[in-house]
Curated annotation (Swiss-Prot):
All copies of domain FDX-ACB, residue ranges: 704-797
Keyword set, alphabetical order: Aminoacyl-tRNA synthetase, ATP-binding, Cytoplasm, Ligase, Magnesium, Metal-binding, Nucleotide-binding, Protein biosynthesis, RNA-binding, tRNA-binding
Binding positions for Mg(2+) per the UniProt entry: D453, D459, E462, E463
Species the sequence originates in: Ruegeria pomeroyi (strain ATCC 700808 / DSM 15171 / DSS-3)
Primary localization: cytoplasm
Gene: pheT
GO molecular function, one term: tRNA binding
Residue ranges of domain B5 in the record: 404-475
EC numbers: 6.1.1.20
Cofactor: Mg(2+)
HAMAP family with a match to the protein in the record: Phe_tRNA_synth_beta1
Designated name of the protein: Phenylalanine--tRNA ligase beta subunit
Record bears the keyword Membrane: no
Protein family per UniProt: Belongs to the phenylalanyl-tRNA synthetase beta subunit family. Type 1 subfamily.
Amino acid sequence: MKFTLSWLKDHLDTTASVDEIAEALTDLGLEVEGIENPAARLAGFTLAHVKSASQHPDADRLRVCVVETNEGEKQIVCGAPNAREGITVVLAKPGDYVPGIDVTLSVGNIRGVESHGMMCSERELELSDEHDGIIELPSGEVGERFIDWLAENDPAKVDPVIEIAITPNRPDALGVAGIARDLAARGIGTLKTRAYAPVPGDFDCPIKVTIDEDTRDGCPLFTGRLIRDVRNGPSPQWLQDQLRAIGLRPISALVDITNYMTYDHNRPLHVFDADKVKGNLRVHRAAGGETLKALDEKEYTFQPGMMVISDDEGAESIAGIMGGDATGCTEETVNVFLESAYWDNVQIALAGRALKINSDARYRFERGVDPAYTLEGLEHATQMILDICGGEASTVVIAGAVPDHSRAYKLDAERVRSLVGMDIPESEQRQTLTRLGFRLEGNMAHVPSWRPDVQGEADLVEEVARIASLTKLVGRPLPRLTDGVPKPVMTPQQRRLSMARRTAASLGYNECVSYTFIDQASAALFGGGTDATMLENPISSEMSHMRPDLLPGLLAAAARNQARGFADLALFEAGPVFHGGEPGEQRAQIAGLLVGRTGPKDVHGAARAVDLYDAKADAEAVLAAMGAPAKVQILRDGDGWWHPGRHGRICLGPKKVLGVFGELHPRVLQAMDVKGPAVAFVLWPEEVPLPRKSGTTRAALALRDLQAVERDFAFVVDAGVEALTLVNAAAGADKALIEDVRVFDEFIGGSLGEGKKSLAITVRLQPTETTLKEKDIEAVSAKIVEKVAKATGGTLRG
């Protein structure tokens, strides 16, 4: 919501500065998002007088001017066609920043002639698009600040523009009058009350309006009147300036008046060209399939049940959202029908979302407008049209009635203290509510029609506290139930996630926090995107489904970083993923993503691309931090978004999956617009077994008194035999002595023959009772060879 300071002062008698107003608005809950003050960018420019202007000796289109400034006479080279002796101009000196051309001036040399400054055009000062010549002022003293001259002669050019963020519960603040009311209640000036007398009708309105019975819940009230013999030319300069200041383009007097009413009083209106309306108007629900070309020149198809305004020949307006092109006003329009109606906010929101139309009218109606101002807004707009466009007005046609909005709640002065903790005198509380438009009868506060958000006694307390300022609230420490510093309360799952985050960060990963909603295509890549995870009311089409995995968010972040030149990335995230709407279909997950290289090239060699072993090592480190057992199995056959043959599942047995690591499928990387190589891991903290003991200290490391022995074995097996099968067989030969089995070599080809390979392992034997003798080692070795042969069909390589 944007408005200018002068516009605000139309409703508020105040001497407060822009900064004071901005601070008060933010404190009142109307957060100021920005202030555009033209005076700030024009502060350095001064007025000067051209004493002489002669032809440049080396350029036909340039003139050498002698300019009188507050620092004496200066020579300036100028190419403007209107640069001549005797005019008063706006001067930019060396060192001044000229916003329209984004240049800080310095003393220049133009074709051999020095130039000590610049005489500015309106476009160079961002005052307008005019750039045919330099600014000529009808008055002004040499050295006078240009902003001071503008403030006196053309104040709209230096009128500050304030932009505030409006929360959905404050539709009254979508009008400048509502903002002024809040400021007046705070004490930042006095509210200017305006009474708009009804405009008497000079003739009966020839256009009648009816509302179908099944549509009255969506349109309780419709008012309108015919105004004939209007002149729809350009609107007055003051109106054009106000609209331009807030980013609206002036179109014509009639359209500008309706736009003004929208922002001034949060009262959207619509103007029909009455000569194009065929017969009477009817508010009804669409049967479905009807089409209408709207004012944005797009054609829309109505769904069954949408509210429509039709004449005798068909639909002419999308009710409460946008008018039709066929009955729109042009410069030739002389007779108009002015509409002011009250529409149900929910039905307008549903229709606008279905038709994908974002208009000022929809934005306001779906948040709620003042139902009691419907007729008064019509009278106000009628008077503006008569004043600006001329003409004569008919009597008002009214269909329906103002919906009952009356409600009252008890004002309990003690509730402010109990709910907010502020001591505010009862008289001040009553005065605050009165200034906000509440009507007090005894201890009952009647809510004004423009405040649909006030729905109970607690809301009255909020209004009182908001106007008094919550910055005055004094903090009080909570009472302690126990002495000393309380211990943090964390569940085992929370402790695991915290430790996992710290470990991933210590490994060099940057934490991401992404949306839990993603688009359907991305969700489908990772096993989701079904109706079970589709949102009923998504923020946008790109956020239509709950995420089935954390990797889509990490890949999207990687794609954005790569698009900005960051090729090497290490990202992780911890959060929930979803496979349905039931509690058991939501799980916690930790995911990490490595993209690009592990580091830059250096004196030790070239940069190394990330591989699946990087992801494996990091996954094991995070699992260890969460308390996972050291001995796990690495199995094949992960999900389809992993590269086949280049990933593994970290398991405790065939069914207990702790996580997955490996390369991502090239198809997934291409779909997510990520340039590889890319490896990742995902972990399931809930699958990590809890420790049997609840002690917080880790057991001391047990060192063996007896020396361990290592023996190497090389087995020739079929090419299809997995190394894990061989390792498990060797480890099971003697579980009491064999502490560890590791693969250290694989060989294919040579004398082994077709379909064979050699796998070499190191077996570590750790005695517990006595030192191993050679015969003991040989006995264990024989068991290992026997077990491997039985499990894999392999033979010891000679």
